[in-house]
Amino acid sequence: ILTGEGAVDNISNLLNILALNNTISEKVTEARLIANRRWSLKYLKNTIIDLPENNPEKAFYKVAELDKKYGLLLNKLKKIDLRVNDRMIIQLETLVLPEKDNNI
């Protein structure tokens, strides 16, 4: 699904980004162009990947790198926000805390 004003006109930009990693790209179910400036991708219908306006290719590649090395996208993530330069803000779908051991 492709949405957002100007999305069709910017499809080549999106395809260049997605071409950086076919494994992740194949599981992107939606791409939304925000304010005709940056892309927001939906991965496997539940994780949002917000790419920055500047150098989205580098940010997408970083996600792919971390997924390959640490299995980043195997986690139940609600959002990966890459809009802040040199930062990755991850929002969990649910937070599971370990049970308290009363025997200690």
Question: In which residue ranges do the predicted regions lie?
Answer:
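Charged, solvent-exposed interaction patches on well-folded alpha/beta domains
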Residues: 1-104
